[in-house]
């Protein structure tokens, strides 16, 4: 009798829910639908963010041509300035006051009167830099202000920006690494359809490349995303270093007036205040160049065994190098023709780029070594079996 009862219980357990399979299928379908909806929702959010940043970024670029108050004037007390209300600190370097020469526009409280770019981006970033500079300043009459407070505040701002964008930067770098790793297979696909001019062959080639990218989870837009995010950040910090009153008042190390334009000073006042800016450019420009060159060198070392063999891939690589060279000359021109404060920002930003690129390089190398060790362990297990 107990045996029969146990058998009956077993049968009841196995046949308790006749709709169990259907429930599992429905649950899986619901999960798939949820994943599809989530993916679509995330894409829509990304598109919205990109459109928003594009509009605001273009606004920030073009409003200088449309609005007179956005024209930066590096003379203290002229143009648009961000600082404290007159009489707040009693320090002329921080309190907003006109020099009575030309138009003057004060930005001491939050407002959208100067446009969304200034209100939503420049103002919040300035509220990080301004209090740090004031708290670490050399008080009037207590000594010479060498500008260490400005360097500290920009380092804090750049660190916060890097922490916010590190996920985007790392994903972009890893995506480019994956693209380098599959260059050999990509070269095989290109060689397979070499010389093919019919529409079907071109379509098949494109489908195979898309399949390869999908298999390795590669997004070809990764590099574009990084550039897209970097440009608005540059515009924000550019506006800060050209409109923040205490930065305009600084003579860095009692040697470089950050309100001056290096190239203008070199050609206009070479014997007095101009020649120090030659040293300034000699320091800043090579560091900018290294911040672009060294990451390429590290990437080449990582991908020595994964280089492309197709002529088309080599041509694409050469185009990339040319574009990077063009960018370098553009940045060099901006440094030479903008206020020296912009050059200080580029210098610090280049140092951050070098540090982040090196840490990313070490991370990728260690991750690859770990993968190799795991593969080696798996091979040993398979051999034993």
Curated annotation (Swiss-Prot):
InterPro entries linked to this entry: YidC/ALB3/OXA1/COX18, YidC/Oxa/ALB_C, YidC_ALB_C
Alphabetical keyword list: Cell membrane, Chaperone, Membrane, Protein transport, Transmembrane, Transmembrane helix, Transport
Transmembrane segments annotated in the record for this chain: 39-59, 112-132, 150-170, 222-242, 247-267, 270-290, 325-345
Keyword Chaperone: yes
GO biological process: protein insertion into membrane; protein transport
CDD domains referenced in this protein's UniProt entry, alphabetically: 5TM_YidC_Alb3
Gene Ontology molecular function: any one: membrane insertase activity
Subcellular location: Cell membrane
An annotated GO cellular component: plasma membrane
Membrane topology reported for the UniProt record: Multi-pass membrane protein
Domain of life: Bacteria
Family: Belongs to the OXA1/ALB3/YidC family. Type 1 subfamily.
Function: Required for the insertion and/or proper folding and/or complex formation of integral membrane proteins into the membrane. Involved in integration of membrane proteins that insert both dependently and independently of the Sec translocase complex, as well as at least some lipoproteins. Aids folding of multispanning membrane proteins.
Assembly notes: Interacts with the Sec translocase complex via SecD. Specifically interacts with transmembrane segments of nascent integral membrane proteins during membrane integration.
Protein known as: Membrane protein insertase YidC
Organism whose genome encodes this protein: Mycoplasma genitalium (strain ATCC 33530 / DSM 19775 / NCTC 10195 / G37) (Mycoplasmoides genitalium)
Source lineage: Bacteria, Bacillati, Mycoplasmatota, Mycoplasmoidales, Mycoplasmoidaceae
